[in-house]
Structures are given as C-alpha cells and as structure tokens.
Amino acid sequence: MSVFSRLRNGIPPSRDDCQSPYERLSQRMLDISGDRGVLKDIIREGAGDPVTPDASVLVKYSGYLEHMDKPFDSNCFRKTPRLMKLGEDITLWGMELGLLSMRRGELARFLFKPTYAYGTLGCPPLIPPNATVLFEIELIDFLDSAESDKFCALSAEQQEQFPLQKVLKVAATEREFGNYLFRQNRFCDAKVRYKRALLLLHRRLAICEEQHLVEPAELLVLLNLSFVYLKLDRPAMALRYGEQALLIDKRNAKALFRCGQACLLLTEYEQARDFLVRAQKEQPCNHDINNELKKLSSHYRDYVDREREMCHRMFAPCGSGSSVGGN
C-alpha cells in the first residue's frame, strides 16, 4: 500500500476539505523542533534510551514527495544498510533531529519543512523548490561512538588515569563496531576496530590486580581477530591470535577451532588435526567442528595421493628413449 493510500485510509477527507495530504497528516503529528518544522508520528514504539548525539546509527529510510507514491530516496533495497554517523554522514537537519528522538526498534514517519530538508532551492531535478518531504525511518540500532572516539584520541599516559570500567566500556564499543563492520563484510575495517580494542586492553594487563578482569574481554577480541584474519585469507595471523586466545583459556573450543582452520589452510595437517580433535572433545556435537574434521580428512587423503604419485614418478625406471640429449 502506498504512502498516500495510507494517508487517505488514516484521515478520510471531507467534501469541503481542501487541505493537501501532508497538511492533513501534520494535524496529528508531534512537533519535535519547536517551530513545526519537523513533525513526527510514531508507527511502532522502540525501546531503551534515545539516540545520543555523535552516535553512529543503523537505519532504513524512504523519502517521499507529496502526491508521489514512489520514494525519491531509499536505502531499503540494501541487504545491510551502512552505519552512518550523526553530524557527518547525515546531511538533512530534519533527519538528524528526528533520529535523536528515536529509540532502538522504533519506526516513525516524519514531515520535514524546507528549512529542515532541501531548502528554498530544492535539489533539481529531483526535489522542487520549497518542498516539504515525508520520511519513514526505522531505527535498527545505534552505537554511541563519541566517548570511544575521544578516549582513543588521548595519549597512553592520559588513558591510564581512567578507571578500568571506563577502559572496558570503550573496548567493548570498539569491538561492537568491529562486529558490525564484519557483518557488512568490511573485514579490513573490522580488523582496525578489533586492534584498537586489543591495544586498550593490553595497556591494562600490566596492572596485575586487574588482569582477571581484563582477560575475559581480551579473549573475545582475540577470537574476533583470529576469525577476521581467516576472512582476509591470512591464516598465519589467524593462528597467531587463536594461540594467544588459548593462553587465556586453553580449552576454549572456538579458539581451538580457529587454530585448526588456520592450520588446515597452511597445510599443516597434523597440527590442524590436533586442534580440531581438542575442539571436538570440548564440543562433541558442534557441526562446524565435525565438518572441518571431515574436510581435513579429505584434504589429507588428496595430499597423500599426490605425494605417492610424485614418489612413483621420481623412482620409476627410465625408459629406453628417455636419456638426456636423445633424439
């Protein structure tokens, strides 16, 4: 059903009603700008805290001109919308104000007057002058990066002055960013975030009384780094971080599995088998581990067959016409 069909269904116009669809809709909307330049109608309530200034948001949106059923702008066709930072990636003032009023999971409809949208000139040929536009926005999630960005900009000496809980919070935020970028297949960017988190945690490991509090967070980041290096086709680095994770928890099934995967890619079959069998011992019913062991068995059989064929050729008796220099 189109936007304007919904408007008509929501507010049936009377015979003498000469108002436009946007004017009718605006009568039931909440003024969030103070001058009725940005109006809001909540379609589905969200939960938790509202978006914070300087946050990075994950949203789906569609923008409509009045009397038009098809959006002039939308990111709903994307499988995974990109993360956008307030104040940098979002250019519409109205959208920024609207997002600051939203909570996770919320779906809302907004009307933006020209001052909060495309101005008096519009954006030819797509947006006419003095256009009021309607946006439907769904806030999927947001990450508050302001605190993390400010903290990471400090020197190591300055960071050491903060309590451990602050460091753990910033490291967790960096890891969350990395996880989001990983889900978008932006593996190099994810790696940078994970390494930032690891650096913050390593600086606190020097304080002995904090080690037992830092290591659980460090373990998660090391597992992330091992996985992202597998995705980047760098198994040696994946093995390195996986082994560091095992120094914290030698029975961690995920770390053992990552090390096994890395060794298989490095064609270190005996090592791969050792890691994977240990992982299977921890999680006997894990399908990924069991499938990787089957994959290892297949690769090893192929390897043995190739070695046998090579040896056969090396030591096969020479034929009568195979001498060097023969015609």
From Swiss-Prot:
A molecular function (GO) term: Hsp90 protein binding
Region annotation Disordered: where it falls in the sequence: 1-20
Main localization (coarse): cytoplasm
GO biological process, one term: positive regulation of viral genome replication
Positions of the PPIase FKBP-type domain: 54-143
InterPro entries xrefs: FKBP6/shu, PPIase_dom_sf, PPIase_FKBP_dom, TPR-like_helical_dom_sf, TPR_rpt
Gene3D superfamilies (UniProt xref): 3.10.50.40, Tetratricopeptide repeat domain
Compartments where found: Cytoplasm, Cytosol; Nucleus; Chromosome
TPR repeat start-end pairs: 171-204, 219-252, 253-286
Keywords for the protein's UniProt record, in alphabetical order: Chromosome, Cytoplasm, Differentiation, Meiosis, Nucleus, Repeat, RNA-mediated gene silencing, Spermatogenesis, TPR repeat
Gene Ontology CC terms, in alphabetical order: cytoplasm; cytosol; synaptonemal complex
Disorder named in the UniProt entry: Defects in Fkbp6 are the cause of spontaneous male sterile mutant 'As'. Males are sterile and aspermic due to abnormal pairing and misalignments between homologous chromosomes, non-homologous partner switches, and autosynapsis of X chromosome cores in meiotic spermatocytes.
Assembly information from the UniProt record: Interacts with HSP72/HSPA2 and CLTC. Interacts with GAPDH; leading to inhibit GAPDH catalytic activity. Interacts (via TPR repeats) with HSP90.
Chain's role: Co-chaperone required during spermatogenesis to repress transposable elements and prevent their mobilization, which is essential for the germline integrity. Acts via the piRNA metabolic process, which mediates the repression of transposable elements during meiosis by forming complexes composed of piRNAs and Piwi proteins and govern the methylation and subsequent repression of transposons. Acts as a co-chaperone via its interaction with HSP90 and is required for the piRNA amplification process, the secondary piRNA biogenesis.
Family the UniProt entry places it in: Belongs to the FKBP6 family.
Name of this chain's protein: Inactive peptidyl-prolyl cis-trans isomerase FKBP6
Annotated organism of origin: Rattus norvegicus
Gene that encodes the chain: Fkbp6
